[in-house]
Amino acid sequence: MLDVVWLIPALPLAGFLILLFGGRRLGEPAAGWLATLCCAGSFAASVVVYAGLLGESEEGRHFTQTLFEWVPVGALQVDVGFLADPLSITMALFVTGVSTLIHLYSIAYMHGDGDFPKFFVYMNLFVFSMLMLVLGSNLLVTFLGWEGVGACSYWLVSFWFSSEANATAGKKAFVTNRIGDWGFMLAMFLAFAAVGTLNYDELFAGVENIAPVTATALGALLLLGAVGKSAQIPLYIWLPDAMAGPTPVSALIHAATMVTAGVFLMTRVNPILAAGYEWVPDMIAWIGVITALVAATIAVAQNDIKKVLAYSTVSQLGYMFLAVGVGAYVAAIFHMIAHAFFKALLFLGSGSVIHGLHEEQDMRRMGALRRFMPLTAVTFMVGWLAIAGVPPFAGFWSKDDILLFAWGSGGADAKVLWAIGLVTALLTGYYMSRQVFMVFFGDARWAGTAAPSSAGHGGEPADEITPGAAGDAGEAAVAADPGTAAAAHGPAGEHAEPHESPWLMTLPLVMLAVLSIAGGVINLPFNDDVDFLEHFLEPVLGENEAHIAVPTGTKVTLAVIAVVAGLIGIAVASAVYLRRRVRAVEPEVLAHAWYYDEEVSAFMGGPGRKSFDGIAWFDAHIVDGAVNGVATVVRAVGGRLRSVQSGFVRSYALGVTVGVVVVLGYFLTRLSF
């Protein structure tokens, strides 16, 4: 059963190739159905391999399949192969499962788009690349998938490239990720220099024999790659702008799969982190918890329905980094899976709202949609309760695990990490409740040309909102382009009554809602008081997993405190945006994301540009000048010598004569003295 692991990435690759060369001929909706079936087949193959692993003993849950030798260069021997172990197959299951639902949703969402087949070409290629990333048996194959998802992200974010904002957002995502990719590449060079291999099995066995400072440097470089891909401080600025792509792209790439690649990488290389100094895990924890808090504060003041979810994603990824930093690797994977369920649900739900409102994304022009889109509203609220950490939804169990490990990690800063995580949980309950109340409750603000500046500003009118002004780089920006799905849905701000989405869009919402409710069971104890997911991942993560000693009473107390924090956030949002008893406070500094993006842009356009110009001048005049100078000298000397080779016998005879005279003169002079 394990031998079919190659089929998991092969099916999306086959779908990509078929659609690349025959997508136009297949047309709509056949191209979408083919892409969806390829993902579904990949999910089925993942289930088969998963069942095969369950049938093995814990020691036997490790299978490497080599397809061919890729790089046979001296000591560097790299194969294209797949590693089927509990971690990789867990990732493959939720990547292919969620991807299948998003592909199904996209068939209806992208209906009428002039580039319908091309969209699914990119989507299948992305799924293939993501599976290469998680299944690769060595760092180089993982890096191949790593770069593949980055390229697909660029193509999909800027899919509606007729809008300059979309094209710019795609470039921003691509360039920002290059910084992290630089760290990943340096890590591969260092790993080969220190251990002599890039294969995971040999690398993890050999890392115990290298100096701690080398292991620390290796972990720090890999962390740089993870920070870029998973949108952590300071490289998070690309993710909110990436909402410019079609909403299914936001759900697939920027919520459920690609952005979790950094967390997966840090979890995969846990032996390297364990072999180095403790300051690298500490740094991971602090990067995560600060990112979680900062992104949550930004989310409370956003009005674009997708921007709220974007900053929420950055915040939840911060929780996962916190888990990795305190050694709670299972909790990180658990929250990654739960987050994939409820965040994909929330993004697809927002897409359903945007579709039903004819491409409107500004929450100030929504309201009362639960009466017109009941199924979307109910499923969206399931995702809301899950991310807010309300039991028994999936987010409660996974977030509680992370906060528990932060509390019991034993470090001097353990309680501080826990406290910041708790405040973030409160803010999460607040901003997600704000979104739900603004979109689905209150007065219908979509029917007029003016709306309250926020749903809870005491009902005071605000400046008129231009139809379609919702997303500064979203679907509304291209609604007028006849070649886009936005045009098929209708122009933003159109005063038609909102409508529920078709069944191809609502069916994935229902299935993801069920997973968001029941997803927590995957890490509940079933036998011998051992959590299922923890037991399954034991062969990969057990050796370096943190073990904490927290009394049962303390665990219950911490869980109750976390739930109460989320409920306080919900209650405050209710008072402000639902019952309107309190005037909303949305500082401009938060609406502008602490002006961090502006400062980065100003630096890149000012001092940064001058620095880069200086580097370019140094490269052109000093580095290239030295190389070109040597060539110029050699060329000049050669030109002078070339004149000696005249081709005339008399010239050669003269040269010989002069040479003989010089030699004789030299010896005569020596003999005279």
Enumerate the predicted regions with their spans.
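Hydrophobic transmembrane alpha-helices and their helix-loop junctions in integral membrane proteins
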Residues: 100-145, 151-494
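Hard-cation-handling environments
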Residues: 446, 455-467, 471-568
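Alpha-helical transmembrane segments and their helix-start/interface "positive-inside/aromatic belt" motifs
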Residues: 28-42, 171-181, 371-380, 499-514, ...
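Membrane-interfacial helical/loop segments at transmembrane boundaries in membrane proteins
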Residues: 59-77, 199-207, 398-405, 409, ...
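Hydrophobic alpha-helical transmembrane segments
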Residues: 75-95, 214-226, 417-425, 546-569
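Transmembrane helix-loop-helix hairpins at membrane boundaries of multipass inner-membrane proteins
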Residues: 1-4, 22-121, 193-212, 237, ...
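Hydrophobic alpha-helical membrane-insertion segments
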Residues: 37-54, 180-189, 380-388, 508-528, ...
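Aromatic-capped, Gly/Pro-kinked transmembrane alpha-helices
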Residues: 74-83, 503, 514, 525-561, ...
